[in-house]
Amino acid sequence: MTKKEQALIEQYAKSLVQVCQERDTLEALQADVLAILEVFKATNLAKTLSSLAVPRAKKLELVRQLQGDNIIYLNNFLEVMLQNEREAYLYQVLLRVLSELASVSNQYDVTVTSAVPLSEEQKQRVRTVVSKRLAVKTGRLIEKVDPSLIGGFMISVNNKVIDTSIRRQLQAFKMNLK
């Protein structure tokens, strides 16, 4: 992706988030964007919208089906993207909208990788640790299981990592022995 395309995607995303922030509809925007992204993940929609082989009329129909019960600002935004023939960038723009929302609200997705699945109590403790140590609000808690950690966990938030895994401790111990 070129710098020009990245700037275009960023500008569209920032504009939508700014409008929704002014209208105090950020939570509704986030819910609607997540729902649309689920459609993208469940289908080949991103490839279809960026394909030159698919007629423009079909692309318009597909994007208009996404509008549904979304907040008016998102539906208007989708129309603007169609009018400007930017539907090929829709998936990347929506992903960027989520990162802009996280930045504006200081609420980030937290990825927790552990050797075994976490209990609800442990998930709550992770949220507390993240808010205290990293000074961010917890968005979605994304849980991954990786038995190679042996024990402990890794928390990743906004490009920051807390690694208390036994695997890392063993690696550090090995390095100290050299």
UniProtKB/Swiss-Prot annotation:
Broad class of the protein's primary localization: membrane
InterPro entries, A to Z: ATP_synth_OSCP/delta_N_sf (IPR026015), ATPase_OSCP/dsu (IPR000711)
Compartment list: Cell membrane
GO molecular function (one): proton-transporting ATP synthase activity, rotational mechanism
Domain of life where this protein originates: Bacteria
Family note: Belongs to the ATPase delta chain family.
Role according to the record: F(1)F(0) ATP synthase produces ATP from ADP in the presence of a proton or sodium gradient. F-type ATPases consist of two structural domains, F(1) containing the extramembraneous catalytic core and F(0) containing the membrane proton channel, linked together by a central stalk and a peripheral stalk. During catalysis, ATP synthesis in the catalytic domain of F(1) is coupled via a rotary mechanism of the central stalk subunits to proton translocation. This protein is part of the stalk that links CF(0) to CF(1). It either transmits conformational changes from CF(0) to CF(1) or is implicated in proton conduction.
UniProt-recorded name of the protein: ATP synthase subunit delta
The organism of origin for this protein: Streptococcus equi subsp. zooepidemicus (strain MGCS10565)
Organism placement in taxonomy: Bacteria, Bacillati, Bacillota, Bacilli, Lactobacillales
Gene, per the UniProt record: atpH
